[in-house]
């Protein structure tokens, strides 16, 4: 691949041509791999690991993370696209195919001896015009918490990752989960939506739990497995004897001294446990009230036995991330000490129960009032399907979050690309000189999205583009109906793209494409490139 680097005495123009050819072929190659995934009619890819592990996905981020990419230019494009997903949660595939198409459209001008700098300048002008047009084209929503609008956004995102029937099933749960944790004038924290997986049943199923699901159960056979009307104590207190943080030795002379030392340790832990039992007896003054302890640290067998005899359900070693979720879902305060226990520090839930599935235990905390945390429970027959649903669910949550924060939407189905192409054609007429060739290349590259949507749906790309452009010329906002291949109104059909995703795609892709076009030589660097660029002894 890099054999050209080793050639000596080659002409500068020849080297530049080879470097450009290398970069363009890398962009087009990565584009050809991912373009078939785009849209609701996109195909799946099978990833096979070295150990024989198999993963089925059409998510661009998953593919680019898991694929082994040897080509340096392709790796650069992949890093750019995955950064897009880290920022906005979507648009990875669109970014890759846009960069690839920009390089592809530039190639024909380069073959006519147009300097790459001219094309790059055209890209810069077209990028600014495209982003300005996006500001005009977006549709500002007065109420971004409108449930119907958010359902349309979630459905558009999920249908590109999952079969339509499964995506429609998940849509309402994604929207309801976000609306549940939303606090006015505060940023949305998606970590407050726990995604829990359970492998069983014959088909994929997803449910929203307005509470919490913990992936462990009780550790004592006599503890209650189901409680109603529960007070919940969340704490981070060690209910077992712990070794000191500094090395310490305790010396004893005989067996009686050792027994007294062990008894002293047990009494110390048992005293903490009795404080919990006393609080339980204070608040549970009627038989219909119950008590649950969820501890981040350990609970030793003696304390578990004491709690079980008092009728308390005790869970130990809860995950750290679940402690904040518990307090947001159930109320109360997470306690780091048992010295100041009061009824005010307790949360409440109508139902707490344990469910066993094979060798796994799950604890459900349901029936909470005004929860600001929830759990989306995914059930599926295979690990592959569960992972596919989980990846799509994360993208759906990010899509709804982006819409709430953007306070606007963009008509989807390729509508923006068709409209932006027409606007750039008008803009090109106002520019003089060869820079307009870069604008033309950028405009042609925009059409790769509707073309790919049409091709993946089984329709002729050129015929489809002509139909869409003719309809747009009549003054209509028009997108592609992937079912029929005909133009449709994306607003009335409820098909929307995310403003922040499109803005990031058309801000970053021309920058990367321009940088790749301006590379005239590829040089193999030494091992010290990651370290200091200053030779030793010259600092």
Curated annotation (Swiss-Prot):
Q: Which GO terms describe its biological process?
A: protein folding
What main location does UniProt list?
cytoplasm
Its transmembrane ranges are none
**Highest taxon above the source species:** Eukaryota
| Coiled-coil regions listed | none
Spell out the family assignment given in the record's similarity comment: Belongs to the TCP-1 chaperonin family.
What is this protein identified as?
T-complex protein 1 subunit zeta
Task: Name its species.
Answer: Dictyostelium discoideum
| Gene name in the database record | cct6
